[in-house]
């Protein structure tokens, strides 16, 4: 499929609706992307015609459902170029995946006197689990600072690492600033010091191709709902040798090999030992459909279109008086801003009256808000279905708000 904006927009039913009497301009895909018909129908079809509990079922529906679920594991491995399908764990989302790593790998590897590093631009999901881990183990949490332009102070990374540093947890793309970090270089620097690297890819995989083998990351995570897929499903990638050595985090059905009241329990092999209970099979199948949809359009095509649209919005926003934009000029997916002295919630409410959906608040990045000295920001985010006309409406709306509020 070539990149046809008209065709893409027709694939997303919600884009035809109106909000407050205006055509919807959905500029909040970084929070959660809209879903194409192919994804909606894939999940609906499974529940209409193919639903059954997976694993251990001898009947046809169960066997078929299991095969379809495991096919998506293989599909996910292909999507990020993992070496093996067994390096893919189905999780509820990026947040659960990071917590899984912190509670399984982290609890077994970190001890008092050890340390791990996060950056000042992380989403709370890549801060709080590590704070909790450090509180449990007595390890130290270190922070790699950022520059005023929203880039990392990478020159300070070597001095933060020592022989007791076990992990660097870093976002691929900032969910607030749109900063795309030089992940391959960061990973290489960390590995030279013997430090493993976890990458939060929640804001990256929908914008361009990710190759985990080329990056050489130890862990990589993303959520389905930001990739035009359903909520409640995500992917944790971990290198095979790391995953096989990790103990289970949650206990229950499907993650065991044997259970005995007298002899104890033995675990299933990875990745299944990390998938206790009945999985979100419908969501998994729909995530596979989302990957198929994105790949049919082509991530290179999507990246080229979105890069052009980002340049357009940054250029057009220069016409808005008293607009403060945060982050670097070169960015991916998101634009965070404030309008004069007005609170982000007020600006976002006015934009909603004009049919324009943006995100307002601290964006689960309170340390970043503190760094910039603001309680909140507005954030507009771009997806492959957004248009220059929607950008024009955003700009006109902000100019109108400035005139109304002063």
Curated annotation (Swiss-Prot):
Matches recorded under PROSITE patterns: AA_TRANSFER_CLASS_5
HAMAP family: SufS_aminotrans_5
E.C. no: 2.8.1.7, 4.4.1.16
Pathway(s) served: Cofactor biosynthesis; iron-sulfur cluster biosynthesis
Any single Pfam family the record assigns to this protein: Aminotran_5
Record PTM N6-(pyridoxal phosphate)lysine, positions in chain: 226
Recorded superkingdom: Bacteria
One of the GO BP terms on file: cysteine metabolic process
Name the UniProt record assigns to this protein: Cysteine desulfurase
UniProt GO molecular function: cysteine desulfurase activity; pyridoxal phosphate binding; selenocysteine lyase activity
Its job: Cysteine desulfurases mobilize the sulfur from L-cysteine to yield L-alanine, an essential step in sulfur metabolism for biosynthesis of a variety of sulfur-containing biomolecules. Component of the suf operon, which is activated and required under specific conditions such as oxidative stress and iron limitation. Acts as a potent selenocysteine lyase in vitro, that mobilizes selenium from L-selenocysteine. Selenocysteine lyase activity is however unsure in vivo.
InterPro entries: Aminotrans_V_dom, Aminotrans_V_PyrdxlP_BS, Cys_dSase_SufS, Cysteine_dSase, PyrdxlP-dep_Trfase, PyrdxlP-dep_Trfase_major, PyrdxlP-dep_Trfase_small
Compartments (UniProt record): Cytoplasm
Quaternary structure and interacting proteins, as annotated: Homodimer. Interacts with SufE and the SufBCD complex composed of SufB, SufC and SufD. The interaction with SufE is required to mediate the direct transfer of the sulfur atom from the S-sulfanylcysteine.
């Amino acid at each position: 499929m070539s990149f046809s904006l008209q065709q893409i927009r027709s694939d997303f039913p919600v884009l035809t609706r109106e909000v407050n009497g205006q055509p919807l301009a959905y500029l909040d895909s970084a929070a959660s992307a809209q879903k194409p018909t192919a994804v909606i129908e894939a999940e609906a079809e499974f529940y209409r015609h193919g639903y059954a509990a997976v694993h251990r079922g001898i009947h046809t529906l169960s066997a078929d459902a299991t095969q379809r679920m495991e096919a998506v594991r293989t599909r996910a491995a292909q999507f990020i170029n993992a070496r093996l399908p067994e390096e893919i764990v189905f999780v509820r989302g990026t947040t659960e995946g990071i917590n899984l790593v912190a509670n399984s790998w982290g609890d077994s590897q970190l001890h008092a006197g050890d340390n791990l590093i996060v950056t000042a631009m992380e989403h709370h999901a890549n801060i709080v689990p590590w704070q909790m881990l450090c509180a449990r183990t007595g390890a130290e949490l270190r922070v790699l600072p950022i520059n005023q332009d929203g880039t990392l102070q990478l020159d300070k990374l070597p001095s933060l690492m020592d022989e007791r540093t076990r992990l660097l947890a870093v976002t691929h793309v900032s969910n607030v600033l749109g900063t795309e970090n030089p992940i391959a270089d960061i990973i290489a620097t960390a590995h030279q010091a013997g430090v493993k690297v976890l990458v939060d890819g929640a804001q990256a995989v929908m914008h361009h191709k990710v190759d985990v083998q080329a990056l050489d990351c130890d862990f990589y995570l993303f959520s389905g709902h930001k990739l035009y897929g359903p909520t409640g499903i995500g992917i944790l990638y971990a290198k095979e040798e790391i995953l096989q050595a990790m103990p289970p985090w949650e206990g229950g059905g499907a993650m065991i090999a044997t259970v005995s009241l007298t002899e104890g329990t033995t675990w299933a092999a990875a990745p299944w030992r990390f998938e206790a209970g009945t999985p979100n099979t419908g969501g998994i199948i729909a995530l596979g459909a989302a990957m198929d949809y994105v790949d049919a359009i082509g991530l290179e095509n999507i990246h080229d279109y979105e890069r052009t649209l980002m340049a357009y919005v940054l250029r057009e926003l220069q016409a808005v008086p008293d607009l403060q934009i945060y982050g670097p000029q070169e960015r991916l997916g998101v634009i965070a801003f404030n309008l004069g002295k007005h609170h982000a919630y007020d600006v976002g409410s006015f934009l909603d009256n004009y049919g324009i959906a943006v995100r307002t608040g601290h964006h689960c990045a309170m340390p970043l808000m503190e760094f910039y000295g603001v309680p909140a920001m507005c954030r507009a985010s771009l997806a492959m279905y957004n248009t220059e006309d929607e950008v024009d409406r955003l700009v006109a709306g902000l100019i109108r708000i400035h005139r109304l509020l002063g």
